[in-house]
Amino acid sequence: GYVCSVESNNLTVATNNLDFLKVLNGALVNNCDGSVLAKILGKIHHEPLDSYIGADIFIKYVKMCRFRQFFLGNTPEVLAGLKSNLSKIDPKINGMRFETLPFRKVDEFDYEGIAKMINDDNPDIIWVSLGAPKQEIFMSKLEPYLNRGVMFGFGAIFNFNAGVGGVKRAPNWMLKLRLEWLHRALEQPQKNIPR
């Protein structure tokens, strides 16, 4: 199965695209990846809801040091930085797979071939970094070919933890005030403000 990290962009796409809504509805779990979204949904459902940020989920699982993990997507530079930094947390990560994917449309991937590569490695967790909404659609198409493991589509976490490429997580004071959305908008305005 797969887990999606749903923020306002994914929700907007799902509202306008029934196929993408089916992808989100097909997930094992959709975590609310934004405090503003949690507040809005809490008001709609008349109960307090909280967000659980994908970057926090990612680092929590890495720090557990007990899962075989597979890291899929992004660039060779980001994957090299990610492997180096995560190996400081869990040295076993040095022996885990970090694989890029060719840049192409989501319908053009060789899902059987990708699944064979993953199945041969036999991971518990498959982290997918292709950016939303592409990674969610990718996971839904890859799922039927996998023998085991849970996929997590948390795109920017590779960049946050790689220490390369200029994409950084918000400073702690912004995280405490739940202003990570503002930090991301200011860091990459052409990408995040239209969302």
Predicted feature descriptions by range:
Residues 8-11, 130-135, 157:
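Short glycine-rich anion-binding loops that position phosphate/pyrophosphate groups of nucleotides
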Residues 23-25, 143-147:
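Short, conserved loop/helix-junction motifs that constitute active-site signature segments
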Residues 38-117, 121:
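Conserved beta-alpha
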Residues 118, 122-132, 148:
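Proline-aspartate-enriched helix->loop->beta-strand connector
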Residues 184-195:
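A charged, well-structured terminal subsegment
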